[in-house]
């Protein structure tokens, strides 16, 4: 009986913390792919790859915050807030990064920064 209650509680907690929109079979965040497509042509992004990174980083949950100060769908780190504020022309805060459009736009700006530095756009999300 205790095991059944614990399992039910785990399912309930999981349903409260997950958006339920992820394509679990493909490990992608398909509902956010149109936003990724907005930035893909200018950044040379592979939509499927970025969608899989998004799934891995946040499980398609825009409000997620890690214990290492990473926020949102693509887990943008706080160390980038000043740079992003300067480049986007408006205050970019932790709360702002919880907005899917802002988070993906921020990732696109960081991609440009890394490419200009001769690095891969995918480097922050790649797994060694």
What does each model-found stretch correspond to?
Residues 1-8:
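N-terminal export and membrane-targeting signals
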Residues 29, 42-43, 63, 67-128:
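Catalytic and binding regions of secreted/periplasmic enzymes and modules that target cell-wall glycans
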Residues 3, 13-60:
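Export/targeting segments at the very N-terminus of extracytoplasmic proteins
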Residues 9, 13, 82-84:
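Residues in flexible loops and secondary-structure boundaries
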């Amino acid at each position: 009986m205790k095991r059944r209650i614990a399992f039910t509680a785990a399912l309930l907690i999981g349903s409260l913390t997950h958006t339920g929109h992820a394509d679990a079979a493909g490990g992608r965040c398909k509902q956010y792919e149109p936003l990724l497509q907005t930035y893909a042509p200018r950044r040379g992004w592979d939509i499927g790859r970025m969608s899989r990174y998004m799934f891995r980083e946040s499980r398609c949950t825009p409000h997620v915050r890690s214990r290492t100060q990473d926020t949102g769908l693509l887990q943008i780190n706080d160390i980038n807030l000043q740079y992003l504020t300067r480049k986007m022309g408006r205050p970019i805060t932790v709360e702002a990064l919880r907005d899917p459009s802002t988070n993906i736009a921020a990732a696109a700006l960081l991609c440009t920064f890394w490419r200009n530095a001769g690095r891969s756009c995918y480097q922050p999300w790649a797994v060694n």
